[in-house]
Regions:
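Flexible loop/turn connectors
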Residues: 218, 223-319
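Central regulatory/effector-binding core of bacterial HTH transcription factors
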Residues: 71-117
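Flexible loop/hinge segments that line or gate small-molecule binding clefts
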Residues: 87, 110-154, 196, 236, ...
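Hinge/beta->alpha junction and helix N-cap segments in small-molecule ligand-binding domains
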Residues: 55-64, 82-91, 144-154, 170-216, ...
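Short acidic capping loops at alpha-helix termini that bridge into adjacent secondary structure
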Residues: 166, 198-201, 252-257
């Protein structure tokens, strides 16, 4: 096998037969050889890494997105490398600065709201940049996601069509969670168009958990016992709320309806299926990775809008 062929196999480039490829890779494994990607990157000005910047690893949403990205990059020679911002703009700036210094082949990052410094770095990077999870705004390069305003409005339609009118909202008091804020804005706007106002709202600090959902649900229903529907900003607190209501004898969905957001697998294990919205997380990850890998062309307007889908579940009255 020639040096050129070995080089092509190790760089995952060019047309090499499967048998020859396997022979080269077996020899490399036997020798414990790991190619120096930085040296290779100096020649091409790019390494085979895709920077993936997300706000949280504890949030159940992002592992699904990462799964979609990883599955789509699997046959490309590109590897996702993850940075976490904890919903902090300054942390996002630092993560992007470090990751872009490696000259990755592309960047996938959550959200459309970034600091001026982050936007400047991404504008000047000269590589594919895909902002994910949201399409309500103007992308730097390409956006792949759902409209959270639309998701909120469509859930409002569903709740009103089922006959509920005394509606409360429970969500995070996190100013940097722009997508949750847009969902609530779309939700309230649609309620207002139908002559209904939110009857109560309860905000919490920090991350979402079943316990937080239980506590917030108890608090809002103690304060406003006449509520007939609770809209939660995500499934985790919605699931906690559902468990609290069931333990306390609420007639669901007759006396009280509940809905969350995301469509996470956790809901499969609950005694009742929580009404929610599928946020298309795996599809978003896949489509973003396809654009970075060059499998799919960037759309002319830079936006790939997927449709949020309501999953009716069992916690809303049939209508």
């Amino acid at each position: 096998v020639s040096e050129m062929t070995v080089s092509r196999v190790l760089r995952n480039r060019g047309d090499v037969s499967a048998a020859t490829r396997e022979k080269v890779l077996t020899a490399a494994r036997t020798l414990g050889y790991v190619p120096n990607k930085i040296a290779g990157g100096l020649a091409s000005q790019r390494v085979n890494l895709v920077a993936v910047v997300i706000p949280s690893l504890s949030n159940m949403v992002f592992p699904d997105v990462l799964g979609g990205i990883s599955a789509e990059l699997d046959d490309t020679g590109l590897q996702p490398v993850v940075g976490v911002t904890n919903y902090s703009p300054s942390r996002e700036d630092a993560v992007l600065y470090d990751m872009l210094s490696w000259r990755p082949s592309g960047v996938i990052l959550a959200g459309l709201e970034h600091s001026r410094a982050a936007r400047a770095m991404l504008d000047n990077a000269g590589l594919p940049v895909v902002e994910i999870m949201d399409v309500d705004g103007t992308p730097i390069d390409t956006a792949v996601g759902i409209s959270h305003r639309r998701a909120g409005a469509e859930m409002a339609d569903e709740i009103l069509a089922a006959g509920y009118r005394r509606i409360g909202f429970i969500g995070t008091h996190m100013p940097e969670d722009h997508r949750a804020r847009k969902r609530l804005a779309g939700f309230e706007e649609r309620l207002g168009e139908r002559g209904v106002q939110l009857a109560a709202r309860e905000y919490y600090q920090g991350g979402s958990s079943l316990l937080k959902g239980r506590e917030m649900t108890e608090r809002i229903l103690t304060r406003e016992p006449e509520l007939d529907f609770l809209y939660f900003s995500n499934d985790m607190i919605g699931a906690g709320g559902l468990l609290w209501c069931m333990e306390n004898g609420y007639d669901i969905p007759g006396r009280l309806g509940l809905a969350g957001f995301n469509g996470v697998e956790l809901l499969d294990g609950l005694p009742m299926r929580l009404t929610t919205t599928d946020a298309r997380r795996i599809d978003i990850g896949r489509r973003a990775a396809r654009i970075v890998a060059g499998k799919e062309a960037r759309p002319e307007n830079g936006i790939i809008a997927l449709a949020p889908t309501i999953l009716p579940g069992e916690t809303i009255r049939k209508h």
